[in-house]
Structures are given as structure tokens and as C-alpha cells.
Amino acid sequence: MLRSCTAGLRSIWALRGRREGAPRLSMDLQPARRLFSTEKVIHKDWALPNPSWSKDLKLLFDQFMKKCEDGSWERLPSYKRRSTQESEDFKTYFLDPKLVEEERLSQAQLFTRGFEDGLGFEYVIFKNNDEKRTVCLFQGGPYLQGVPGLLHGGAMATMIDIALGSCTGGAVMTANLNINFKRPVPLCSVVVINSQLDKLEGRKLFLSCNVRSVDEKTLYSEATGLFIKLDPEKSST
């Protein structure tokens, strides 16, 4: 999409240049510019405040950053893409080479970070390792609408999956996710997802969470999940 838009703009600029006698930008400079811009976006930490964050989200963020000062909590960074080493390790141990298209995989981005600021998933996760729990602050943007004015249930399920997974502390995959939706979440509102690790059995991790309003008075959802820790010696390849 972005490539097609860029190509279209390039054509328009070229036509205008010929008609108006404006100097044309040297084409050999453009790839370097585009690459620099892409790299900057990829390595940006998206779990930090931006202008689209509401007052509630910013206030909660500041409160948890205070809790991080004594080391009991930590903010988890979030990027659009996994590091090159992580991606290579995952491909080596867990992906069937016959099912991987290298060109497509090189363009892959994290689903929840594929939206412009404020339009989709705005969230940050804080983790307490000693208590084996996380708190996810989530604001769902207008592109996540289901029923008019309400957040799509699938978007909420996605965030629950991410929040539970953040409690595991390793490479895992979701085996089971059970969600009880109590109330619909208003679009563009802020919710707090409290997750915890309940039990560990070998490679199986059992977790639970609840989704509440900022004032904690409204319970939107409750969920449980079973995650499996990935083992290179038992890879699918």
C-alpha cells in the first residue's frame, strides 16, 4: 500500500516538474532516504506516549513509571518488528522452511503495531517479575470499532492474548484462550488488563486476567489461557 502510494506521488511530482520547469530530485538519493525512514520506524519503541493518548492513559502511564523507579516493576518496550536475531532463531527452530516465503516474511510487522498513532492499538505493558503478573494499559482507536461506538470483541481478544503472553517471560504460543465478555468496551476508552501466572506444569503455563475500567468499577471481561513454552528440541521442523 505504502509503495503504491509512494509510486503514485512520484509520478505526480515528475509530471509537475516537467510542466512547471521545476528541478527533479535525483532518483539515486531516494532509496537511501526511504531506507533510513523505514529503519527509524522499525526501531522506534511504540510503548511510549504519543499525542493520541488520552489523559487517562497518560496518567496511568506516569503512575506505573513511578512504580518502576524502585525496580519492582518494569516497562516492556514494543517494536513493529522482532530483532533480526529473534526472527532467525524462530525460523531455524520452529518454522517449516517449506511454508516460509522469505520475501513476505521480511516485510512482516507486529499486527497490533501496524496502525498510525491513535487509530488502532495504543498500549503499554508493565511487568512485576516477583509477583509474576503484568498490567496492560490499553486504548482502542476508531479503526477497532465493532458495533457502532463500541470496541470490536476480536480487538479485545487480541489484547487479552498479548497481555497474558507477556506474563510468560519466554517464547510461547497460545494453546487455549477462554474469554467471558461481561460488558462492551466503549470505543477510544482506556481499560486496564491485569494478568497473572497461576500455575506452571512443565512447558504448560496457565494464566488468567481481567479487564476493567480505569476507576476499576466496571468489569468488561475475564479470561483464562493456556500457553506452551516452545522447545527447540521439539520443534515442528
Curated annotation (Swiss-Prot):
Keyword S-adenosyl-L-methionine recorded: no
Modification sites for Phosphoserine: 37
GO cellular component: cytosol; mitochondrial inner membrane; mitochondrial intermembrane space; mitochondrion; ruffle membrane
InterPro entries for this protein: HotDog_dom_sf, THEM4/THEM5_acyl-CoA_thioest, Thioestr_dom
Active site (UniProt): 161
Modified residues (N6-succinyllysine): 55, 66, 98, 204
Transit peptide region: 1-36
BP GO annotations: fatty acid metabolic process; negative regulation of phosphatidylinositol 3-kinase/protein kinase B signal transduction; regulation of mitochondrial membrane permeability involved in apoptotic process
UniProt subcellular location: Cell membrane; Cell projection, Ruffle membrane; Cytoplasm; Mitochondrion
Annotated membrane topology: Peripheral membrane protein
GO function terms (MF aspect): long-chain fatty acyl-CoA hydrolase activity
Keyword Cell membrane attached: yes
Family of the protein in this entry: Belongs to the THEM4/THEM5 thioesterase family.
UniProt subunit comment: Homodimer and homotetramer. Interacts with AKT1 in the cytosol.
Name of the molecule in the record: Acyl-coenzyme A thioesterase THEM4
Lineage of producing organism: Eukaryota, Metazoa, Chordata, Craniata, Vertebrata
